[in-house]
Amino acid sequence: MSTFTLSDLEAIVAIRAKASPDESWTAKLVTAGQDKAAKKLGEEAIEAVMAAVKNDRANLIYESADLLYHLLVVLKIADIPIETVMEELQRRTAQSGLSEKASR
């Protein structure tokens, strides 16, 4: 089992975001702005969905990694730490999914 966490990935994204856009894909996305990063996130989400529909386990793992990475880039640009998202997930799991949905 891997000990690598989303917080670890978030730290890598933060470091790479400070690099030259000529040398780092992360920096290039951050420099291009939220529209470009969000578009890329959407593309990766579609690719993950396609892999899931095809029951392509290996590709679903690969595309899920891309999806998580691009989500963290979008969160970085929006200045939202992954911890904030995890807190929201924790809040939601304190009640049943149906109760949470009804409370919206």
From Swiss-Prot:
Cross-referenced Pfam families: PRA-PH
Enzyme nomenclature, EC number: 3.6.1.31
Alphabetical GO biological process terms: L-histidine biosynthetic process
Reactions mediated catalytically: 1-(5-phospho-beta-D-ribosyl)-ATP + H2O = 1-(5-phospho-beta-D-ribosyl)-5'-AMP + diphosphate + H(+)
Primary localization class, coarse: cytoplasm
NCBIfam families listed in its UniProt record: histidine_hisI, PRK00400.1-3, PRK00400.1-5
Entry's family note: Belongs to the PRA-PH family.
Name assigned to this protein: Phosphoribosyl-ATP pyrophosphatase
Species, as recorded: Allorhizobium ampelinum (strain ATCC BAA-846 / DSM 112012 / S4)
